[in-house]
Amino acid sequence: DDCGGLFSGCDSNADCCEGYVCRLWCKYKL
């Protein structure tokens, strides 16, 4: 998943949707 590579602290899709910035990325990814 791109989240882990683009945003540090987001190791998985689940973590992606938890963090603020990561959550924004998750929304755009969907």
Swiss-Prot record:
InterPro entries xref list: Huwentoxin-1
GO molecular function: calcium channel regulator activity; ion channel inhibitor activity; potassium channel regulator activity; toxin activity
Domain of life: Eukaryota
A cellular component annotation (GO) from this entry: extracellular region
SUPFAM superfamilies, per the entry: omega toxin-like
Keyword annotations from UniProtKB, A to Z: Calcium channel impairing toxin, Disulfide bond, Ion channel impairing toxin, Knottin, Neurotoxin, Potassium channel impairing toxin, Secreted, Toxin, Voltage-gated calcium channel impairing toxin, Voltage-gated potassium channel impairing toxin
Tissue-wise expression: Expressed by the venom gland.
Pfam families assigned to the protein according to its UniProt record, in alphabetical order: Toxin_12
Compartments where found: Secreted
Family: Belongs to the neurotoxin 10 (Hwtx-1) family. 19 (HpTX2) subfamily.
Domain writeup: The presence of a 'disulfide through disulfide knot' structurally defines this protein as a knottin.
Function: Inhibitor of voltage-gated potassium channels of the Kv4/KCND family. Blocks calcium channels (Cav).
Protein name: Kappa-sparatoxin-Hv1d
Native organism: Heteropoda venatoria (Brown huntsman spider)
